[in-house]
Structure formats: C-alpha cells, structure tokens
C-alpha cells in the first residue's frame, strides 16, 4: 500500500465544524480525538502527518495553551506529528503563480479600500443627521462614539476581513504549509479557503479539515480482521532476531 503523507495547518486540529461532526463540544477533546486517529493511522498504515516547524507547530502549541488544554494534547502533537521546516530555498514556484498572486493581492487591497470608504461615508452621514446641542458637546461625542462609530467600526472590520483576507495567504504559516506539502508531495489538511485556493494553483492535493478524520476512520474500518496489533509490531514479530527499530516514513 502506498504510504500517504499529509501536512497539517493549525485549522486541521481546531476547526469548529470538524468538532461538531465528530461530536465534541470541547476544543481540547476534539484535538485529542483527531490526534488519536492520526496515531492509529501511523501505527497501522504508516501514514505520516507533518507540521511545518516552527511556524505552524508554534501556532498549535499556543492555541492549545490559550484554551486550557492539558499537557497530554501537547504530548500528542509532539509524538504523532512530524515537525519539519520547509525548504524555502529549494522548492520553486513558477513566475506565473507569483504574477497571479501579486495581481490578486492588488485587487483585494482595492476592494478593501472601497469597504473603508463606504464605512467612512456611512459614519459621516449618520453624524450629520444627529442633533448636536452645543452645551452637551461631551455627551454628544460619547453618544456618537457609542451609538454610531462603534457599531460601524464593528461592521467595517467584518466586511474588511471578508473583502481583503478571505481567500488569500495572509500569514507565513499558511505559506509554510504549502511549501512543505509541495516539497514532500503531500496533501494539505486545512479549513482555510486561501490555502485551498493556492494549493490548487500549486498542484498540491487539498483535504478539508472536516473530511480528514472521516478519511482516517474509513481506512481503519478496512483493517484485516486478524490485525489486532500495529503494523510495525506484526512485522517485528515475524522476524527472529529483529533489532526492534521502527522505520518512520
């Protein structure tokens, strides 16, 4: 059987939709369950799951720490995910991809600017139609900030993210995931439209985060009935005098 490789983005472990599909309300329990599936896949099928180091590994570690996950989660990350730095100097990307990315970013920046301008006009219009008693200037300023500006800024931030950030590679870890997957000829696991879009451009296989656990479960359902032990244990027992070393792929 061909050994498969996967490169995980942080969202492969933290995606809310994935937890809901698996039936876990807690982030930490969801992460444990996914990592346990990865462990089973490693032991039974030799499937390797990589994480770019240090960028994505650091994100995962900090995410688990911020959300109060116990040391077991970090131990599972360290044990079952292969930490590897992407070779940024040897993996080449065609100039056409780079050209398209620059053009795409320029378009998104212009769209973001349009959203900002609309927000400014909306705020100015709202202010013009409010009463402004001169003897209550301080109270009026606070009211404008609270009732008008605050709400508009909130809407602006959401619209700006949607217009500018959705569908682009907006962080170094995102790029590391794609470079490492390209280097290893591996599939990317993520819940990020930007990574999905540019994985397609780079010819890298993409598996949505909410599909990945079910894929591993499907593999495990088709284990031979007499295979009750991990693959490497069966192999070692069949060889007398084996050194007991495990070759990780």
UniProtKB/Swiss-Prot annotation:
Cystine pairings recorded for this chain: none
Compositional bias ranges of the Basic and acidic residues kind: 232-242
Statement: the UniProt record of this protein carries the keyword Magnesium: no
InterPro entries, sorted: RNA_free_RNase_P
Chain positions covered by the region annotation Disordered: 226-249
Pfam families cross-referenced by the UniProt entry: PIN_5
GO molecular function, one term: ribonuclease P activity
HAMAP family named among the record's database cross-references: RNA_free_RNase_P
PANTHER family: RNA-FREE RIBONUCLEASE P, UPF0278 PROTEIN TK1425
Record function comment: RNA-free RNase P that catalyzes the removal of the 5'-leader sequence from pre-tRNA to produce the mature 5'-terminus.
Protein name: RNA-free ribonuclease P
